[in-house]
A protein has these predicted regions:
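Soluble secreted/lumenal catalytic domains
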Residues: 1-11, 15-31, 35-45, 54, ...
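An amphipathic alpha-helical core segment
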Residues: 33-124
Length: 138
């Protein structure tokens, strides 16, 4: 049962990373090469880890720096179901794809434009995971 719980936690989190809802043809951005602060990488990696790791914060520090959501905001973010949420993330993926060119150098401007989006996706994943866990165990 622990394995299945870990799988659920991982799945709900991953479904909020835009590149996990990306195009099959480019393996969710894995084949789209970009420069991240002069270092070669791919678009998937930027969204999977590079942006969030840029500030070198622990998960606890990152969580402490997120805005606290009101009950109304949590309720709004928990609306819908898994299909609704993945469709929402897919829409976000389209915006991410449109935000870069192959080989583009990404840096502070990209962070300025998209770090808040990445943080919001993390928050969505967390509050939606809470909804699913409450439905299962509540």
């Amino acid at each position: 049962q622990v394995f299945y719980l870990k799988l659920l936690v991982h799945f709900i989190g991953d479904m909020h990373q835009p590149m996990h809802a990306g195009r099959k043809a480019d393996k969710g951005g894995n084949t789209i090469q970009v420069r991240w602060f002069n270092s070669g990488t791919n678009l998937h990696s930027v969204w999977d880890s590079k942006m969030l790791n840029h500030f070198d914060m622990s998960y606890t520090e990152l969580a402490e720096n997120l805005d606290v959501l009101s009950k109304k905001q949590v309720k709004f973010l928990q609306e819908g179901d898994i299909i609704t949420w993945i469709n929402e993330t897919s829409g976000m993926a389209k915006k991410v794809y449109n935000s870069v060119e192959v080989g583009e150098k990404l840096g502070y401007n990209y962070m300025y434009n998209y770090f808040d989006v990445a943080e919001l996706q993390l928050q969505k994943g967390g509050v939606r995971l809470a909804k699913v866990l409450n439905q299962l165990f509540g």
